[in-house]
UniProtKB/Swiss-Prot annotation:
Catalyzed reactions: pyridoxamine 5'-phosphate + O2 + H2O = pyridoxal 5'-phosphate + H2O2 + NH4(+); pyridoxine 5'-phosphate + O2 = pyridoxal 5'-phosphate + H2O2
NCBIfam families: pdxH, PRK05679.1
Binding-site residues, substrate: K54, Y111, R115, S119, R178, L179, H180
Subunit structure: Homodimer.
EC identifiers of the protein: 1.4.3.5
Origin: domain of life: Bacteria
Cofactor note: Binds 1 FMN per subunit.
Enzyme class (EC, first level): oxidoreductase
Keywords associated with the record: Flavoprotein, FMN, Oxidoreductase, Pyridoxine biosynthesis
Disulfide-bonded cysteines: none
Name of the molecule in the record: Pyridoxine/pyridoxamine 5'-phosphate oxidase
UniProt organism field: Ruegeria pomeroyi (strain ATCC 700808 / DSM 15171 / DSS-3)
Length: 201
């Protein structure tokens, strides 16, 4: 008999992740949807940075970025990534590992259109991860793009989403005296059934 009750109840890890995120959005002071996204470069050297998770789909996690950024290049070279979400207010953590594919269709268009005008223009102006001579140069590029693109800029061809389809999802909750609760969902590839295990703290 499973002892996965309360916040761990249920067999669908995406449903549990959505529930945890919804709870975190009520208690975290800001950016409850922030993830620390880990990638590796061509030499195998790891990189990590904060990114905002924008959707938990029925079978994947979606975020958006500049396709010319260091993270995007590393994502596409490796085809794999991992992230962690940590909520201090809940004393909980979610870890995810899996494969990466682009999302550059209507879903990406819709998300881009939902952003503020300044954020949409900023996506055009920023050549993410490339050297920048000064902030003044960046703001000059924003002004140039604003004049050229107007009030309804289309999604840049170099900007869009990535979908992480997991092969491992781990839920962690703080316990007294470091006796934490950890449950992991694992499978070898997307489409396979999950194997669920409790882990030692």
């Amino acid at each position: 008999m499973s002892d996965r009750t309360g916040i761990f109840a249920g067999d669908d890890p995406f449903a549990i992740a959505r529930d945890w995120l919804a709870e975190a959005e009520r208690s975290e002071p800001n950016d409850a949807n922030a993830i620390a996204l880990a990638t590796v470069d061509a030499s195998g050297l790891p990189n990590v940075r904060m990114v905002l998770l924008k959707e938990i789909e029925p079978a994947a996690f979606v975020f958006y970025t500049n396709y010319e950024s260091a993270k995007a290049i590393e994502l596409e070279q490796a085809g794999k990534a991992a992230f962690v979400m940590h909520w201090k207010s809940l004393r909980r953590q979610l870890r995810v590992r899996g494969t990466i594919t682009r999302e550059e269709g209507p879903q990406a268009d819709d998300y881009y259109a939902s952003r503020s005008l300044k954020s949409r223009l900023g996506a055009w102006a920023s050549r993410q991860s490339r050297p920048l001579s000064s902030r003044a140069a960046l703001m000059a590029e924003v002004a140039k793009i604003t004049a050229a693109k107007g009030p309804n800029p289309p999604r840049p061809p170099f900007w869009g989403g990535f979908r992480l389809t997991p092969v491992e999802i781990e839920f962690w909750a703080d316990g007294a005296f470091r006796l934490h609760d950890r449950f992991v969902w694992r499978r070898n590839s997307a489409g396979e059934s999950w194997v669920i295990q409790r882990l030692n703290p």
